[in-house]
């Protein structure tokens, strides 16, 4: 009886943690079937691989972050929305690059990659500048979306990483071979649109409950659990690519994902609800985000190969960052 009474307070936390994991599974599954359905639709209508790469694939891989951020903002949890984006950008560099290079090294000397990293770095600086205004409002959201439009326009003019474009062509070709019927395509699209919001609601609601129960801020939940969970699709994809010895494409995907997170996800979310910026973000987390962006930019400019030793350092850096967040929040 005594043991049962001791375990009772933790049961709610275990249930919430389980619901968060279920939510992540729904987000990952929903994003995957949404991309598959959209690719199949594009293949049937012979849509340009370039257009598919810039829209369908980019939106699909960032769908978990987008839906979680929108739902967080609507429900009054702006810290989770912004923490999700900032934390995902940090995890993308330290974790999503750090893990696969333990399996196979990643080359940074790729056509057009230096220009993409420059855009990511400039976008990061501009994004942090907007955060220091204290609130991301509709006006700032429009500015971010205008930046996204410029980025996509530049990509449409041919400033697209060639290896990434070839990967999209391969995906389109693979889907086209199956000659899927319209009803199956619509089933995939509909399933993705249903699973994503359900998964997002589980993650946001249960994550908020955990923050209250553990006595830590919603910002920390957004930066850690939520950001890590929404980055799982990118991590799984890069690890799979590493086993195929094709990790070079993953680097361009990480850079593109970080740009998309700041411009599209925050931009769209700000159109729906104003995002108040927690002071904790400005004192520590945005500087970590800028530091890892600068590291990646420098690595690409030097044309160095990111190998196992550097991967270990990246993972240690991510571990220290998470440790600092959790211990700082609990103290």
List where the protein language model places each region.
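Hydrophobic alpha-helical segments, chiefly the membrane-spanning helices
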Residues: 1-331
């Amino acid at each position: 009886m005594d043991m049962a009474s001791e375990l009772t307070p933790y049961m709610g936390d275990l249930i919430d943690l389980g619901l968060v994991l279920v939510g992540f599974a729904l987000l990952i599954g929903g994003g995957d079937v949404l991309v598959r359905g959209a690719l199949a639709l594009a293949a049937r209508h012979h849509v340009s691989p370039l257009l598919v790469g810039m829209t369908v694939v980019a939106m699909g891989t960032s769908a978990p972050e987008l839906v979680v951020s929108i739902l967080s903002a609507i429900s009054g949890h702006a810290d989770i929305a912004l923490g999700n984006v900032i934390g995902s950008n940090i995890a993308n560099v330290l974790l999503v690059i750090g893990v696969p290079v333990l399996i196979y090294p990643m080359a940074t000397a790729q056509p057009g990659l230096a220009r993409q990293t420059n855009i990511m770095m400039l976008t990061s600086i501009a994004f942090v500048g907007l955060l220091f205004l204290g609130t991301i409002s509709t006006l700032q959201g429009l500015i971010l979306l205008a930046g996204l439009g410029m980025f996509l326009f530049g990509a449409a003019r041919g400033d697209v990483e060639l290896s990434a474009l070839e990967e999209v062509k391969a995906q389109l070709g693979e889907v086209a071979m199956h000659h899927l019927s319209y009803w199956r395509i619509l089933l995939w699209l509909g399933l993705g649109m249903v699973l994503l919001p359900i998964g997002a609601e589980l993650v946001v609601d249960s994550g908020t409950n955990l923050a209250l129960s553990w006595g830590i801020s919603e910002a920390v939940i957004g930066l850690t659990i939520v950001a890590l969970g929404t980055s799982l699709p990118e991590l799984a994809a890069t690890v799979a690519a590493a086993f195929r010895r094709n990790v070079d494409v993953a680097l361009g995907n990480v850079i593109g994902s970080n740009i998309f997170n700041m411009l599209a996800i925050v931009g769209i979310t700000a159109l729906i609800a104003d995002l108040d910026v927690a002071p904790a973000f400005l004192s520590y987390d945005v500087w970590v985000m800028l530091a890892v962006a600068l590291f990646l930019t420098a690595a690409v400019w030097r044309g160095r190969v990111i190998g196992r030793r550097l991967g270990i350092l990246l993972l240690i850096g991510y571990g220290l960052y998470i440790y600092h967040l959790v211990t700082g929040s609990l103290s």
